Amino acid sequence: MSNQNINITADNITGKCDLKCSYAFKYSESNSTAKNNGVLIDITYDSASVSPVIYNTEKYNVSKIMITSPSLHAFNNSSMPGEIVVEHIPVKGGNNLNICIPFISSSDSSTASDLITQVIQKVAANAPSEGDSTNLNISGFTLQNIIPRKPFFAYSTGRNDYIVFGAIDAIPL
């Protein structure tokens, strides 16, 4: 999954996204595990009894979460220190949906940055080698506290739809 060539910037906006970029979510808490894949951390997410995401009237379930370093996307022609990608699969078939949020180097803190920092620290301590896995055991771990409720960029490539939050809404780490 390489989207480094996709530059997320207000200069690239074309068209108006009225009623075709409807995104609603309600994620539950998850008892996740994480796997160290070198420059990538793969995170599991518990299945929900009700699909946590509706995008353009279609329901989606979380299939996995990835933390990458550096970012997969460019933001205003620059790479960011990292990015979280939440991959969703459609309930009734169709394109996968990927929610992408960049990380920014900052001393600021938020609930999202606290959760991501805990994931990274637990992987570093309990799964230090590539291929190692660990149970995260993070109280209150939910994507509800990570995904911004802000405007976003949207694009499609082949079998994947993307929602990407801009650098202004990056998670401070």
What are these regions (language model features)?
Residues 1-173:
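Alpha-carbonic anhydrase
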